[in-house]
Regions:
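Conserved structured core elements
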Residues: 174, 188-191, 219, 268-271, ...
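Beta-propeller folds
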Residues: 7, 16-417, 423-429, 433-434, ...
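Cap/lid segment of the alpha/beta-hydrolase catalytic domain
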Residues: 157-171, 183-188, 203, 436-440, ...
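Active-site-proximal cap/loop segments of hydrolase catalytic domains
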Residues: 526-719
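Sec-dependent N-terminal signal peptides
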Residues: 4-12
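Hydrophobic/aromatic beta-strand patches that form the interior of the parallel beta-sheet core
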Residues: 126, 226, 493, 522, ...
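Glycine-rich His-Gly loop
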Residues: 130, 326, 423, 494-500, ...
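Extended hydrophobic-aromatic, low-complexity segments
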Residues: 288, 313, 332-334, 344-349, ...
Length: 719
């Protein structure tokens, strides 16, 4: 027996060593795997003003064409995608433990409270809630008088589980509180169907609406909805506004406005009062506005003849329209009041808020007695409250250096208060109720992270970097207070710089996995974004687009020169068309970046803009028109795919979705192929294409796993 007691541990030890050796051998083999061999074909883009050689054009195929799995070119592209995915998976093999560790951190930190929302509509209070296991919301409601008796009335998780891809567009309760209308995309094509759920009968009515853009508006009768449907006609994308009636006598679908001869896109909204529907055609920086008076059951009425570059946004209060407009070169917008009966006489409009050079009117919320304006001063939100009865106004302001505040869930036209969400880079999101008369600020909901989090451990600040032309570029920062600002910390930088968008300066639980590892996290607010208003946007558009790239470069240099972090540890992240800015920077100054992570990046800009089947007017307005010679060559001078040279490229990881409708999967694949061809470094250049398996960004489990992959990749580069 004694001999066996000795032998068994020896056998087990030998077995463990064998398993470990086998695991190490597998890991070694995977790390030594070479990148896929990529075929090259001579293809010449015969553009109007020049020719371009493109050896990887064979990868370019529309996602809809990829559905024909029998076509030889489709098989070829799929084989390449699978080879790239296998190569990426091999390189991530050694990062499995780190990825799992990060996923656990995200889940332990994540609080679903921040995702939840609630609002009162008539006699009911509604709750949209998530659980730690759910990807989609559950809808509850209670009597507005007795909030303790909540009843589950709809669960999107029971619907989403039946689809590989499920993205909710819009969810709206009917005015009579009897129906839920929702839109959803189950293919990733951004074509949404609409269903109507009868709460009392527990019955879903599927409509004939299969290809709308996701927007829904209820009519005041609770028996009709308004939506927008897009089609293609001779290669041109067109959109139309429809009304869909589901009456006892049958169903009727009626086209209200047709844009067959116009470009742009539609948005629709219902006034808080319930009387009007406002319809906006956004085209070439111009907004053409229509309204429907539901009391009179009228057809759409044109508010004003379109004027190039002029926008009219409407609200309703009693017998007046409230008008937000940038007419007469008011880039930051003014606010007017007009009698509904005399709206065409702009000379009779009453000025409520004049134009101010340093204040941007972002949004307005109209109540029976008050108007709340969401304004921006130096990039930070403030709420301007106007008393419509006495004409007096006051502000609700905030004290942090950098934060995010926005109006939310204000559905009651007769309310004596408004609600808003407040968050910052270090402050979890909270919902406040602000009383108009007393000016009291009441906390009604706060998201609490599930870990031992103390916001006092972190420092947030806003600094101003000087760009190449002397322009001051705002940069928002967060880091742990115990991090020494001695030029040694790793820097993780994000940014906005396109389409006038602004990156919300809110609490992101996953960011704290980097902060706890000593990162300084930065968000640069570049020209081309909307942080400082419309003028800031226009300063980084079209023939000024390179300014966005220069702003990013100089923001990074400012951080390094002021010892916020190390020049050898700069990491960058960007998504979609906005990633073009970082892609151009990587081309121009690869030595500045240690590692980059991208999601669906728009790197082949020139080819995309010249593709008439998929381009839309907004992209032309933002980047320029390649059919104009000066703009063509300007775009060609910085478009990332056209400007890859022999260089020491950093490590790069790209995630893309096969069904991405805005920036195409082939933009990532082509760019990676060309970079590998030109790079002089041995750094990893990885691309992984999601083949539509639970790809929706609303699937929180998948979204966190993807983020964990990205961060594992970056953190591994510090070793």
């Amino acid at each position: 027996m004694k001999n066996w007691i000795i032998i068994i541990p020896l056998v087990l030890l030998s077995s463990c060593r064998w398993v470990k050796t086998k695991e190490e051998q597998k890991s070694k083999e995977l790390q030594e795997m070479n990148a896929p061999n990529i075929e090259q074909e001579n293809f010449i883009h015969a553009d109007k003003f020049s020719s371009r050689i493109d050896y990887f054009n064979w990868m370019m195929l529309d996602p809809q064409e990829m559905k024909d799995s029998t076509a030889s070119n489709v098989k070829r592209i799929y084989q390449h995608i699978l080879a790239e995915n296998e190569y990426t998976d091999a390189k991530f093999y050694v990062l499995q433990d780190l990825k799992s560790e990060l996923t656990e951190e995200f889940n332990s930190f994540q609080s679903m409270d921040g995702e939840n929302s609630q609002f009162v509509q008539g006699e009911f209070k509604y709750y949209f809630e998530y659980t730690s296991e759910s990807s989609y919301p559950e809808i509850y409601r209670s009597s507005a008088e007795n909030e303790g008796q909540k009843e589950l009335i709809f669960d999107f998780n029971k619907i989403g589980v039946d689809f590989n891809y499920f993205q909710i567009g819009e969810v709206l309760i009917s005015p009579n509180n009897q129906y839920i209308a929702y839109s959803a995309d189950t293919t990733g094509s951004q074509k949404f169907f609409i269903s109507i759920y009868d709460i009392s009968k527990n019955l879903t009515q599927k409509t004939s609406i299969k290809k709308c853009d996701g927007q829904i508006i209820w009519g005041s009768d609770s028996r009709s909805i308004y939506f927008i449907e897009s089609t293609k006609n001779n290669g041109k994308r067109t959109s139309s506004v429809y009304q869909y009636h589901f009456l006892e006598s049958g169903i009727n679908k009626e086209k209200l406005i047709d844009t067959q001869l116009q470009e742009g896109f539609w948005t629709i909204e219902r006034s808080k009062s319930g009387r009007f529907i406002f319809i906006y055609l956004h085209n070439n920086n111009t907004v053409t506005t229509f309204f429907i008076d539901l009391q009179r059951n009228q057809k759409p009425v044109l508010f004003k003849e379109p004027e190039k570059g002029v926008r009219y946004i409407l609200g309703h209060q009693k017998e007046h329209f409230i008008i937000k407009t940038n007419q007469n070169s008011s880039d930051n917008f003014r606010l007017f009041k007009s009698k509904i009966s005399d709206f065409q006489r702009s000379d009779k409009w009453e000025v409520l808020v004049g134009h101010r050079e340093d204040v941007v009117i972002e949004k307005m919320d109209i109540f029976e007695k008050f108007i709340v304006l969401e304004e921006k001063v130096d990039g930070l939100e403030k709420f301007h409250i106007l008393n419509s009865e006495n004409g007096l106004g006051h502000y609700a302001e905030f004290q942090e250096e950098t934060y995010s505040a926005r109006l939310v869930n204000n559905n009651d036209y007769y309310a004596e208060y408004f609600t808003y969400q407040y968050s910052s880079l270090s402050t979890p999101p909270s919902i406040f109720l602000y009383e108009f008369e007393s000016r009291k600020n009441n906390l009604i909901q706060r998201s609490e992270p599930n870990s031992d989090f103390d916001e006092d451990d972190f420092k947030t600040e806003r600094i101003w970097a000087t760009s190449f032309d002397g322009t001051k570029i705002p940069v928002s920062l967060i880091y742990k207070k115990n991090v020494s600002l001695d030029g040694k910390a790793p820097i993780f930088i994000e940014y906005e710089g396109s389409y006038g968008n602004t990156k919300e300066l809110s609490f992101k639980p996953e960011r704290f996995s980097l902060l706890e590892r000593g990162f300084v996290c930065a968000i640069a607010h570049l020209r081309g974004g909307g942080y400082l208003g419309e003028k800031w946007h226009s300063e980084g558009m079209k023939l000024r687009k390179v300014r966005s790239v220069m702003d990013l470069e100089y923001s990074i240099r400012h951080l390094i020169n002021n010892e916020y972090g190390s020049a050898e540890k700069v990491f960058i992240s960007a998504n979609g068309a906005n990633a073009l800015i970082a892609g151009t920077l990587v081309n121009n100054h690869p030595e500045m970046i240690r590692g980059a992570i991208f999601k669906n990046p728009g790197f082949d800009l020139l080819t995309r803009l010249l593709n008439e089947e998929n381009i839309n007017r907004n992209e032309i307005e933002e980047w320029g028109n390649p059919e104009i010679e000066e703009q063509y060559f300007y775009i060609k001078s910085y478009s990332p795919y056209e400007n890859i040279h022999s260089a020491y490229f950093p490590s790069i990881f790209i995630q893309c979705d096969l069904n991405s409708t805005k920036t195409k999967f082939w933009e990532s694949l082509k760019w990676v192929a060309r970079v590998r061809e030109k790079m002089t470094s041995s750094n990893k250049i990885l691309v992984h294409t999601n083949l539509n398996k639970k790809a929706s960004s609303q699937d929180k489990t998948v979204a966190l796993e993807k983020k964990a992959e990205q961060f594992a990749f970056l953190i591994s580069l510090l070793d």
